[in-house]
């Protein structure tokens, strides 16, 4: 009897799983849109969008008996991810009414990262899931998907966690593109979560861009509930150890080190930008209190001349008013910083993943030359 040929990955999902994946993909997209543009007045709108998607997914998930499946079987993995998403959708409905609607909404979205944790190991096995973890502009790139899948078995590639399990603080998560080779230097993105956040959650804000464009991605977790804004050296020591460890094992381009972050993470990135010995070459604070660098007269007297900054702020940010962001950007420019200020009309106090390509193009145009 002739042996069956081994399956070459990435392969198409089996027909019996395509409806489930279609539903997962649709609700993940809806959740992603909510995460990117969540604003208190928009919570009911997003809840209305999620409700029918969750109802359809729930029906499909409940029809699958996972007790009869191996834990790592694709059907079981997709179902486990679906359970996380259904929990998030249910909790999000509770954010329609107060008090503290925005806090409820943020808490409801936390299982999305766990759903991604479960799904991502299938990205290099199945075309549809691989496409989901790429930027829209790169999803049709067959050669990219194949190069990622062929090298996926290497234990020093892909997604790794270093003392960064949820519940632990002070560690970091690292993504090394599966098609990494040590014969050239690779750019590194370091992304800092917001207050009360965690690196293992925030990494999903950047992973598809790093995977699509060939960047290493390090996402640390602050030692305390947020970054050491009043004593920058506390968390800086951990960041330096992380950089030393990553650079010692992988070929990191010291001329392309991006430090970005959301809210407190963005504020902390700006505090590090004025440190003379900072190893970072570019800074991209998002929804941050950049005005902390200004003195009482509104001037920036810190050494920022020629510092490369891409500042992103939402016109409807409810935490840090946009007027302060505009004034800080002008003060940085007056002080000699090489600053690009990007104001997004419909952005509140969120991380806008759709701005990542522009940040990367500013950071390293070479990443787009062959795309």
Give residue spans per PLM region:
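Short beta-strand/loop motif that positions the catalytic acidic residue
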Residues: 310-313, 317
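Gly/Ser-rich "nucleophile elbow"/oxyanion-hole loop immediately N-terminal to the catalytic nucleophile
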Residues: 178-184, 228-263
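A domain-start/cap signature at the N-terminus of enzymes
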Residues: 2-185, 371
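Primarily recognizes the serine-hydrolase "nucleophile elbow" in alpha/beta-hydrolase
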Residues: 202, 247-248, 255-305
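Short substrate-entry loop that stabilizes the transition state in hydrolases
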Residues: 180-228, 292, 318
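Short, proline-enriched alpha-helix->beta-strand connector loops that line the catalytic pocket
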Residues: 303-309, 335
């Amino acid at each position: 009897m002739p042996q069956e040929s081994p399956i070459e990955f990435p392969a198409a999902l089996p027909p019996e799983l395509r409806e489930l994946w279609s539903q997962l993909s649709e609700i993940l997209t809806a959740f992603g849109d909510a995460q990117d543009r969540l604003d208190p007045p928009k919570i009911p709108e997003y809840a209305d969008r999620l409700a029918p998607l969750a109802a359809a997914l729930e029906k499909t998930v409940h029809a699958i008996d996972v007790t009869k499946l191996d834990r790592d079987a694709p059907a079981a993995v997709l179902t486990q991810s679906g359970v996380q998403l259904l929990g998030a959708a249910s909790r999000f409905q509770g954010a329609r009414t107060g008090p503290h609607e925005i806090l409820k909404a943020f808490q409801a979205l936390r299982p999305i990262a766990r759903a991604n944790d479960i799904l991502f190991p299938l990205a290099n096995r199945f075309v549809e899931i691989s496409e989901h973890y790429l930027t829209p502009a790169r999803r049709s790139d067959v050669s990219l998907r194949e190069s990622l899948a062929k090298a996926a078995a290497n234990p020093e590639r892909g997604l790794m966690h270093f003392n960064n399990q949820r519940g632990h603080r002070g560690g970091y998560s690292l993504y090394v593109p599966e098609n990494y080779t040590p014969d050239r230097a690779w750019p590194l993105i370091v992304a800092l979560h917001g207050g009360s956040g965690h690196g293992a959650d925030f990494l999903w804000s950047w992973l598809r861009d790093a995977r699509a464009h060939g960047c290493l991605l390090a996402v640390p977790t602050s030692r305390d509930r947020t970054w050491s804004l009043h004593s920058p050296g506390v968390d800086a020591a951990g960041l330096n150890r992380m950089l030393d460890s990553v650079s010692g094992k992988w070929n990191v381009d010291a001329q392309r080190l991006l430090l970005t972050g959301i809210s407190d993470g963005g504020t902390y990135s700006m505090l590090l930008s004025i440190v003379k010995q900072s190893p970072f070459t570019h800074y991209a604070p998002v929804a941050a209190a950049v005005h902390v660098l200004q003195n009482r007269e509104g001037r920036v007297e810190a050494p920022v001349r020629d510092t490369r900054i891409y500042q992103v702020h939402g016109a409807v940010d409810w935490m840090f008013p946009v007027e302060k962001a505009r004034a800080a950007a002008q003060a940085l420019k007056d002080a000699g910083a090489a600053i690009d200020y990007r104001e997004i009309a419909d952005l509140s106090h969120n991380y806008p993943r759709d701005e990542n390509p522009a940040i990367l193009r500013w950071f390293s145009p070479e990443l787009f030359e062959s795309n």
